[in-house]
């Protein structure tokens, strides 16, 4: 399956058309961004690590009954995916307090959230991805009530699967975001799951093993990503 025209270039991925109108090529680049793209740097091997990491996670979620857009790996940095009609709202699950939640509520980083929090954010870099709720989604027609309920159900199911997966690997799944789209009328998980869009801490040391290493200038970004992948059993070679 050959990629054709570039359809969209995001902060860290590029989407291409193929000869099949129902399939796309998703290319993971070495770019890493923070501050809604205000700061961008390149890290060797990052595209490869995130591509293979995402493929591994999407397969685990598919095995658990969560429909995903993943078809197959094409190369170290590319995968073939179903073309989705993407919902312009991202779903976030928080198992522990971190990031914007700590700033917004003035609570201590790391406290356990039981039950986990579920947040919705409008995907809009210019507006810094504002937080919204179900009422906004319905009023502005971003997603139907039924499809949003399905997105929420699948997000919580993914959380159950991934919390155990990471716990077994000695990691805490602090929080993560998921994006969904429609494929022939069905809600399907799209975009990616990687340390770019999740927070992962070492269970023993609470060391941050995700993109916060870049956001907070801690260093060792790729080393952390590769360490997480190895713990999970992701084949990087």
UniProtKB/Swiss-Prot annotation:
**Biological process according to GO:** 'de novo' IMP biosynthetic process; cobalamin biosynthetic process
Q: Which domain of life is it from?
A: Bacteria
Q: Provide any one GO MF term from the record.
A: ATP binding
**EC numbers on record:** 6.3.2.6
Q: Which InterPro entries match?
A: SAICAR_synt/ADE2_N, SAICAR_synt_PurC, SAICAR_synth, SAICAR_synthetase, SAICAR_synthetase_CS
Q: Which reaction does it catalyse?
A: 5-amino-1-(5-phospho-D-ribosyl)imidazole-4-carboxylate + L-aspartate + ATP = (2S)-2-[5-amino-1-(5-phospho-beta-D-ribosyl)imidazole-4-carboxamido]succinate + ADP + phosphate + 2 H(+)
Q: Name one Pfam family in it.
A: SAICAR_synt
**Enzyme class at the top of the EC tree:** ligase
Q: In which pathway does it act?
A: Purine metabolism; IMP biosynthesis via de novo pathway; 5-amino-1-(5-phospho-D-ribosyl)imidazole-4-carboxamide from 5-amino-1-(5-phospho-D-ribosyl)imidazole-4-carboxylate: step 1/2
Cellular component aspect of the GO annotation? cytosol
Swiss-Prot/TrEMBL keywords: ATP-binding, Ligase, Nucleotide-binding, Purine biosynthesis
Read off the PANTHER family from this record: MULTIFUNCTIONAL PROTEIN ADE2 (PTHR43599), SI:DKEY-6E2.2 (PTHR43599:SF3)
Homology family: Belongs to the SAICAR synthetase family.
Q: Which HAMAP family match?
A: SAICAR_synth
Q: What is this protein called?
A: Phosphoribosylaminoimidazole-succinocarboxamide synthase
Organism of provenance: Shigella dysenteriae serotype 1 (strain Sd197)
